[in-house]
């Protein structure tokens, strides 16, 4: 069975990567019922949070709990995770270059600090996609008002880790519609010139 990516749109975009047997849920968001309804009777083998903000991670325990799946988060976002889930810690500390496998495809962890210190992207060469959380969106960068965003680091992460991917790669963001690396590359210089005030706020992102 071929791997595919399903989407649930609620507070954020949730991406479900897998086939008819097993899936990995990326950014479970806030609505566990909606995510699990989309998953159906497939086994959740992992839940990955691109960062620890409430909008992306609130439903992690409920989604993972159904099939006792491990939850993965970069350790640099542990503080924001604890603001949502208290003393319940993630099971896997992600690091740059880590690999998750599902349905015959690999998801590579790309540490992309900026929106938060522990933000990551997940690149799947087999499916020509990168799931980028709040690293960027179709209309620009996504900022956070929690005091942990770093605009310069965010630009650096995008330039070094996203724009270097093949131009046809589909970018699946945490908010809004998908786009391609080629489209992001055309906008990059304008983001630099405009500065941090031009970035789109993400609310509880």
What do the PLM-derived regions correspond to, one by one?
Residues 1-42, 121-133:
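Conserved beta-strand hairpin/beta-sheet module of binuclear metal-dependent hydrolase folds
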Residues 3, 10-12, 95, 117-119, ...:
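Short beta-strand-initiation
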Residues 5-7, 91, 111-113:
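Short Gly/Pro-enriched turn/cap motifs at secondary-structure boundaries
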Residues 23, 111, 117-205:
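Metallo-beta-lactamase
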Residues 24-26, 46-49, 111:
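Short catalytic-loop micro-motif centered on adjacent basic/acidic residues
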Residues 26-27, 104, 173:
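Small/polar loops that bind or transfer phosphate-bearing groups
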């Amino acid at each position: 069975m071929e791997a595919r990516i399903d989407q649930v749109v609620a507070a954020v975009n949730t991406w479900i990567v897998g086939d008819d047997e097993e899936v990995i849920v990326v950014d479970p968001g806030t609505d566990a019922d909606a995510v699990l309804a989309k998953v159906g009777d497939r086994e959740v083998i992992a839940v990955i949070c691109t960062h620890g903000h409430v909008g992306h991670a609130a439903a992690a325990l409920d989604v993972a709990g159904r099939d006792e799946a491990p939850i993965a988060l970069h350790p640099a976002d542990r503080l924001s995770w604890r603001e949502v889930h208290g003393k319940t810690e993630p099971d896997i500390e992600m690091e740059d270059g880590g690999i998750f496998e599902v349905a015959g495809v690999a998801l590579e962890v790309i540490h992309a600090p900026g929106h938060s210190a522990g933000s990551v992207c997940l690149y799947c060469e087999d499916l020509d996609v990168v799931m980028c959380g709040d690293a960027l969106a179709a209309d620009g960068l996504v900022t956070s008002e929690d005091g942990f965003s770093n605009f310069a680091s965010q630009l650096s992460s995008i330039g070094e880790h996203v724009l270097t991917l093949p131009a046809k790669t589909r970018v699946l963001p945490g908010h809004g519609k998908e786009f391609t690396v080629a489209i992001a590359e055309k906008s990059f210089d304008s983001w630099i010139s405009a500065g941090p005030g031009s970035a789109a706020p993400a609310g509880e992102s």
